[in-house]
């Protein structure tokens, strides 16, 4: 069981339940469990779902690069469901293997630099210096570089957060489900 007990499907609000069921049916999500956790904050569940639905649709980097980044982020964050799922038809097992060994494979220069950016942002963000940005600028526009950075930051943060929740943990939850925990807040001390 995750650290925070997922909201049971039959206890979800109609909006949250529709988001989770349609997302899983459409193949956007490999498992409903993280979404059942995010449903504690309906606003954030909806925002996350909107972001996921936009990914690769009309964005400047394209679906293949964004999918490679999502998988690499999952590898770095040790998110098993996301490592195993493929959300873009062009991604092969060979492509995924290339994410672990950047010297081999058939990745394009844009793909290789995108994955390298993700790796550096994860492990040594100080190495993303002027020279690296100049290298990026040889194959990307400024708008694509911004999209790359924001996509990597969002994906990496999400996978690390999901990892901390122990989505597939076997221990009892630290925070048990209670309906009064959904879309509510404890007033900060000293605030009237």
Language model: regions and residue ranges:
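Mobile cap/lid helix-loop segments that border enzyme active or cofactor-binding sites
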Residues: 1-63, 88, 180-192
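Short acidic alpha-helix initiation/capping motifs at coil-to-helix transition points
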Residues: 25, 43-48, 78, 113, ...
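Short amphipathic alpha-helical boundary/capping segments
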Residues: 56-61, 104-107, 134-139
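Alpha-helical scaffolds flanking conserved acidic
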Residues: 62-69, 143-148
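Short, thiol/selenol-centered motifs that function as redox-active sites or metal-ligating centers
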Residues: 66-89, 152-155
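Acidic/His metal-coordination segments adjacent to aromatic residues that form catalytic metal sites
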Residues: 95-109
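Acidic/histidine-rich alpha-helical segments that form the ligand environment
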Residues: 109-150
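Preference for long, well-ordered alpha-helical segments
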Residues: 142-188
């Amino acid at each position: 069981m995750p650290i925070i007990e997922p909201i049971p499907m039959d206890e979800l609000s109609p909006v949250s339940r529709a988001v989770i069921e349609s997302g899983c049916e459409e193949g956007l999500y490999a498992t409903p469990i993280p979404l059942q956790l995010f449903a504690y904050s309906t606003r954030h569940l909806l925002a996350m779902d909107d972001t996921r639905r936009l990914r690769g649709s009309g964005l400047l980097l394209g679906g293949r690069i964004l999918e490679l980044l999502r998988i690499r982020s999952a590898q770095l964050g040790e998110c098993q469901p996301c490592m195993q799922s493929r959300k873009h038809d062009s991604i092969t097992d060979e492509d995924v293997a290339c994410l672990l060994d950047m010297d081999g494979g058939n990745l394009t220069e844009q793909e290789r630099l995108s994955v390298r950016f993700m790796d550096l942002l994860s492990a040594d963000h100080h190495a993303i210096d002027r020279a690296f940005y100049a290298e990026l600028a040889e194959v990307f526009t400024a708008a694509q570089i911004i999209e790359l950075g924001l996509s990597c930051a969002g994906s990496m943060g999400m996978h690390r957060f999901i990892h901390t929740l122990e989505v597939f943990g076997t221990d009892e939850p630290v925070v048990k489900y209670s309906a009064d925990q959904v879309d509510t807040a404890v007033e900060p001390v000293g605030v009237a």
